[in-house]
Every structure is written in C-alpha cells, then in structure tokens.
Amino acid sequence: MVHLLIMIGSSSDKPFLHAGLEYLQEKKIDCEVIISSTHREPQKTSAEILMSLKNKNLKVIIAGAATATGLPGVIAGYLQETNIPIFGIRFTKEPGQSIIEDATFNLSSMPSRVPLAYTGFNEKGFLHACMLAARIIKT
C-alpha cells in the first residue's frame, strides 16, 4: 500500500534521492517515484497528478525539479482542495552547483490557499521531506 508519491522533473534529479529513499526504506515506507516534466510533458504530468487522487491511501506528495522548479507548484495547484500535504524541493542540475534564487522563490511564494512546504534543496532538502513524510505516514 503506497502512502507516499514522489514526483521529480527529470531523471537527472535521481542522484539527489539516495539518502531520502534509504531513510524511507529503513522506516519501511513504500513509495512510488514518477519522473514527469511540467514543461516538456504537461499532459503526462497532469494525468499523473490526477491519477494519484485515485489512490485513497495517499497521504503525502514530495515533488522536486531543477531549473524553473515548476513541478511542486503545479501539483499544489491541482491538489489545493485536498488534505494531502505537498513538500517541494529545489534541485540543481548537478551536485555542487549553486542555487538559482528565482526558482527557489517560486517554491516559497505560492499564492494564498495553495499550500506548499519548501524543505530545502538537493539531497538534504529531499531527505528532510522524506523525514517529515514519514512522521505524517506513521501517525
């Protein structure tokens, strides 16, 4: 039974998931990881988000992307009328690269009534999101 959905914008974001996925495995939390770009594949992304609503056991979504970092905000917009918390992470294009502040600002300045929690960037931000998700799922 999957309680956690993880959506990332590109396969190049995968290196940042290692510590968080390891943490979830230690806590025995099953998750589904989907790669879908809001900019390159908007229809697929929309379909994936709407499909997630069919999973009545879904408790948390973690979403992250690089460059414009639109994915977490799009998900938050679609799911604003649900009780599903969404954690957003900002990924750089590669480990060690500096953060582009404009994209980070996208995550921390959502419109009112469109909740999205920004948990940081890269591997550390993803790990923090996984830790928070585990707390929600285990309660």
Name the predicted role of every residue range.
Residues 8-15, 32-34, 91-139:
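C-terminal binding/interaction regions
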Residues 3, 59-60, 115-116:
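Residue-level preference for the first positions of well-ordered beta-strands
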Residues 31-55:
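N-terminal beta-loop-helix "entrance" segment that forms/cooperates
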Residues 46-91:
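Glycine-rich phosphate-binding loop
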Residues 2-39:
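Glycine-rich phosphate/diphosphate-binding loop of Rossmann-like nucleotide-binding domains
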Residues 19-22, 47-49, 75-79, 101-104, ...:
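Short, glycine/charged-enriched secondary-structure capping and boundary segments
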